[in-house]
Swiss-Prot record:
It is an enzyme of class 3 (hydrolase). Binds 2 Mg(2+) ion per subunit. The RuvA-RuvB-RuvC complex processes Holliday junction (HJ) DNA during genetic recombination and DNA repair. Endonuclease that resolves HJ intermediates. Cleaves cruciform DNA by making single-stranded nicks across the HJ at symmetrical positions within the homologous arms, yielding a 5'-phosphate and a 3'-hydroxyl group; requires a central core of homology in the junction. The consensus cleavage sequence is 5'-(A/T)TT(C/G)-3'. Cleavage occurs on the 3'-side of the TT dinucleotide at the point of strand exchange. It comes from Thermosynechococcus vestitus (strain NIES-2133 / IAM M-273 / BP-1). It comes from the Bacteria. It catalyses: Endonucleolytic cleavage at a junction such as a reciprocal single-stranded crossover between two homologous DNA duplexes (Holliday junction). This is Crossover junction endodeoxyribonuclease RuvC.
Length: 159
């Protein structure tokens, strides 16, 4: 099963795609899609749409796992909500099955602690995916964490 994890954001959208087979998991691809703060919001959303619309058929996920909106700072939350709307539109158009997870669910699944730090989550991702270095940037690492949590949620990987 191929799972694409998405960490939504207007400035930086992280993605991480893993391939799960029985109890093994391999990274297929990960990275970020960025938009410039100098552009109008509508142009930034259009750019996210275009990039995601291109990325989904390349990665061909069987499931997309998306971080559910979780309130931190209102100014940050608005951009995330706008990016999520674009993501949901693309996923609907591409007929992609969707699983939504909250940040505490992801942290709990990977570290055993719902308030884990970013570095603790990155180390868990590095360990579970047998990566030589910590996955970077943070948004891509978070997306891989979301994909790993989805694989556990679907019963493909035991924690």
């Amino acid at each position: 099963m191929r799972i694409l994890g998405l960490d939504p954001g207007l400035a930086t959208l992280g993605y991480g795609c893993i391939e799960v087979y029985r109890d093994t998991c391999q990274v297929r691809d990960f990275g970020v899609i960025t938009t410039s703060a100098d552009l109008p919001t509508g142009d930034r959303l259009q750019s996210l749409y275009n990039d995601l619309h291109t990325l989904i058929p390349i990665l061909q996920p069987d499931l997309v796992a998306l971080e559910r909106l979780f309130f931190y700072r209102m100014s940050h939350t608005i951009g995330v909500a706008q990016a999520r709307g674009v993501i949901l539109l693309v996923l609907s158009q591409r007929h992609c099955p969707l699983l939504e997870l909250t940040p505490p669910q992801v942290k709990q699944a990977l570290t055993g602690y719902g308030n884990a730090t970013k570095i603790e989550v990155q180390r868990a991702v590095q360990r579970e995916l047998h990566l030589c270095t910590l996955p970077q940037p943070d948004d891509a690492a978070d997306a891989l964490a979301i994909a790993l949590t989805a694989s556990r949620h679907c019963g493909h990987i035991n924690g």
